[in-house]
């Protein structure tokens, strides 16, 4: 085929077939023989148009269906919510044993107990639905406007609240109440489980082996129950403070009262059950039992006494807390945050207990002598570290102690302290709070003139020390002019401060040295001691005697720690070791021993 034939004007169909379809020559020569009518051509065109339209419509529906599936987390949450309700209803009709072989049914309680303690389950599901709906509707910005109507319908169906501070507060309270229910469930479940296991063992093995098994269970459960009840008491007090911001709760419906009432009711039931089980064990064991009836009765009394005691591990503190809530306890300065208390009522309740314990401690002459001697030795060591003679300080300190030993001066001393806000005469209010803590606070915020002198790099350390001492003496001189009693307790106290205040001020504000290390260590020990005596886990608030015993024990431990620090410092000084890092290491080791 030549090029002229292909370019002829009367062969358009053949040229199109050759150029676009690349047909073989056999098909090319058969094209002139094919002839299509007009109707066939119209039918072919309609069929092609319909096929293309169907393809486009199908692809359009497929895209819309994919977008609907992408926005279905709210529907999934709704389905999970309905499934959870269905499962909770099914759990009422059957109970699964705890030690089941099925791993998916382990640690499941009975349906009735689960139904009782899962009152806030819908609230938790609503919280999850709220978070999922907000994240799903705003995750894809291109789809938010297209499906605004569907999202509005879902929100109206689930009645989701608006995220306001009040709603978030209520949501947090619901979750907190859920945690309280779980802890109460653990408390009741653990105690009942121990009773049931003990009763079963007593029936199967006999009275002798039953007592051994039950005693071991009591040791384990007693520690756990005591810690859990302490946690619940703190949680209840925290819940009262939270609810106080919105309204006053009814004391009869308080969880503490309800829990105590339930436990008192359970005690009577447990005693009856235990008596029955013990009688059964005696009848079954017969002569093979090595436990007499008197021993069984004594064991039952010990168990009931421990159960009653575990209801209130800190009765002395609970009574003081009631007084604090009624506004019957006052103080000069609230140190709630510094001593890490749960609230002002908690601080005042513990303060009331500590005041009484301090009075018991100071009744012993040996304890007063120990405190006076320890204080004099520590303060004399601080003065000696400043390379000054502590002789005059020890003299005025002994004069102040002898002045306090005479009871004739106590009335005037009480009046002097009362005029300065100290309304209670005890070791905490006078020594720890009024003298030590106020001094530490004054040293943390010194006057601007002293700060300017100390921070001046062009002045020598000796000049700075002299300036700090002069400033302290001028302040004490001004205070002496306002004294009403010239030979009272405040006068003796100012005489002591004239020797120790400049040294302490330079120790805290001066350069890094052994004096500053010991001053900081002394302050830390005082703060640690205060935090310990205001901690329910460090001291026993069971009674006045136990609290006084623990406070005195902590006093000896902290004093021994300070004396050990001084002893190690003297040893290193004699050995020629002057590196301050050694002192810090030893202080850390000594602190680890106390903690």
Swiss-Prot record:
Q: What is this protein called?
A: Mitoguardin 1
Pfam families in the record: Miga (PF10265)
Membrane topology type, per the record? Answer: Multi-pass membrane protein
Gene name, please? miga1
Q: Which GO terms describe its molecular function?
A: protein heterodimerization activity; protein homodimerization activity
Spell out where the chain crosses the membrane.
11-31, 38-58
> What are the UniProt keywords, alphabetically?
Membrane, Mitochondrion, Mitochondrion outer membrane, Transmembrane, Transmembrane helix
Where located? Answer: Mitochondrion outer membrane
Report the protein's function.
Answer: Regulator of mitochondrial fusion: acts by forming homo- and heterodimers at the mitochondrial outer membrane and facilitating the formation of pld6/MitoPLD dimers. May act by regulating phospholipid metabolism via pld6/MitoPLD.
List GO terms (cellular component aspect). mitochondrial outer membrane; plasma membrane
Please provide the Gene Ontology terms (biological process) for this protein: mitochondrial fusion
Q: Note the coiled coil stretches, chain numbering.
A: none
User: Could you say which protein family the record assigns here?
Assistant: Belongs to the mitoguardin family.
Q: How does it assemble?
A: Homodimer and heterodimer; forms heterodimers with miga2.
